[in-house]
Curated annotation (Swiss-Prot):
Keyword Ribonucleoprotein belongs to the record: yes
Annotated GO CC locations: cytosolic small ribosomal subunit
CDD domains (UniProt xref): S15_NS1_EPRS_RNA-bind
Subunit structure comment from the entry: Part of the 30S ribosomal subunit. Forms a bridge to the 50S subunit in the 70S ribosome, contacting the 23S rRNA.
Sorted UniProt keywords: Ribonucleoprotein, Ribosomal protein, RNA-binding, rRNA-binding
Family: Belongs to the universal ribosomal protein uS15 family.
Organism: Akkermansia muciniphila (strain ATCC BAA-835 / DSM 22959 / JCM 33894 / BCRC 81048 / CCUG 64013 / CIP 107961 / Muc)
Protein task: One of the primary rRNA binding proteins, it binds directly to 16S rRNA where it helps nucleate assembly of the platform of the 30S subunit by binding and bridging several RNA helices of the 16S rRNA. Forms an intersubunit bridge (bridge B4) with the 23S rRNA of the 50S subunit in the ribosome.
Protein name: Small ribosomal subunit protein uS15
UniProt xrefs under SMART domains: Ribosomal_S15
Lineage, top ranks: Bacteria, Pseudomonadati, Verrucomicrobiota, Verrucomicrobiia, Verrucomicrobiales
One GO BP annotation of this record: translation
């Protein structure tokens, strides 16, 4: 994959796996991987459904971060290269 995301920079501490920023970064990584998969496997409907669920979850998490901490939201959008 060409757009590897360094998940370590999104962790709040060493064992962090639940913070919103880490979850969003991890979902972005999985979404990119699935998008690449679906470009070659156009008829994989179950993966497409999973992709849509991941995109919706990332959207909800981004809305939460935006509501709670606008500076962190702006930083996440910029570092992950998301359109908003």
């Amino acid at each position: 994959m060409s757009n590897e995301i360094n998940l370590q920079e999104f962790k709040m501490h060493e064992k962090d796996s639940g913070s919103s920023s880490y979850q969003i970064a991890r979902l972005t990584q999985r979404i990119a991987h699935l998008t690449e998969h679906l470009s070659t496997n156009k008829h994989d409907v179950s993966s497409r459904r999973g992709l849509l669920k991941m995109v919706a979850l990332r959207r909800k998490l981004l809305d939460y971060v935006k509501r709670e901490d606008m500076a962190q939201y702006q930083s996440l959008i910029q570092r992950l290269g998301l359109r908003r």
